[in-house]
Amino acid sequence: MQLMTTLGIMARMIPRYHIEMTREALAPHFSERALQMIISANIHQDDLPNQFGHDEIHYDNNAIDAGDRYIYEQRGYILAALMLPGNLGAWVAFGRLIHTAQDFYAHTNYVALWLDEQTGTPPTPAQIDPLKKDLIQSPNLCSGKIYFPMDMLAFLPIFRPLALKLLPKDSHGWMNLDAPNRGFKFDYARAAAIKRTLYEFELLQKLLPPEMFARFTDK
């Protein structure tokens, strides 16, 4: 029971920011009905069953290639779903897709690698390039490893100082940019995630025939 409670705390820390980022990127482009379904599918990716054995959903444990494949798969599900009556399947797949795309910037060191390339005055978060090819393909790109039980305890304020002392620097506890309390890099991760969410939408706009795209946006 304590394990489930702790994991629930882990999952609840993130939805607020997934919701904000998704609305900021997509609100002008979807009906409210569609947007609510996309957001619901997005935040349900952090449900308890997805916390075990699904590193690809969150880009955890260096599952970079698996996370990329998951995004490609969900994109395929969107296209397949829109060939059938109804839009729900496409909205669910898109919500899942953008959750993983957003987690890429919060759970990998992409932001740190991008900032390391900058010289002079640091750029603003709004200037971050979310898909810089040499960084996406960099051998130095990695994501935080989950070390049980310390990584769970790191999400509990009372245990966080002790957990971080015991966790290695490559742990999720040290590397994640899930919330503002993770420092200034959170703003860069958030900005990159919003840009990536819009990119994924615009990619589908290019891929889908106009009538299918109109169904997808429900506008």
Each language-model region and where it sits:
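N-terminal, motif-rich segments that launch catalysis or mediate targeting to/interaction with membranes
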Residues: 1-95, 100, 110-219
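Short Cys/His-based metal-binding microdomains
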Residues: 103
